Amino acid sequence: MMEQIKQYEYVDLGLPSGLKWAKYNVGAEKETDYGYYFQWGSTKPNTADECIWENYKFYNSAKYSLTKYCTDSLYGLFGIVDSKTTLGTEDDAATQIMGSDWRMPTEAEFQELLDNTDNEWIEDFNGTGVNGRKFTSKTDTS
């Protein structure tokens, strides 16, 4: 079933949590658009080539360390970890671009999506030349 929050469409995949997923990636206007590229915690769209450590917002290149969203002291600046695995609204591309009703999914929500949907890799989707992963509900959500 397709619904909308603001101008963005979402789908109900019948997940146990009741979570709804956006029909398209952030920045996409239709299912054959790839949308924007983001590094974790960045709200500024990048090209795929720009998504490298040296450009990462929370990477201290002088110290080869993470300054935020770090769960391992080996990588934290001066060994400091913040154990953050969920984006703050100020660092959430979906929230910043699509509005406060939207956010990037957590790792657990991605796992729920994988565990409770059928998904397949599609090449040349409907003759458009676009490749991507298609997720389909395992339950009837109509």
Model-derived features: where do they sit?
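Conserved positions within compact, well-structured domain cores
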Residues: 1-142
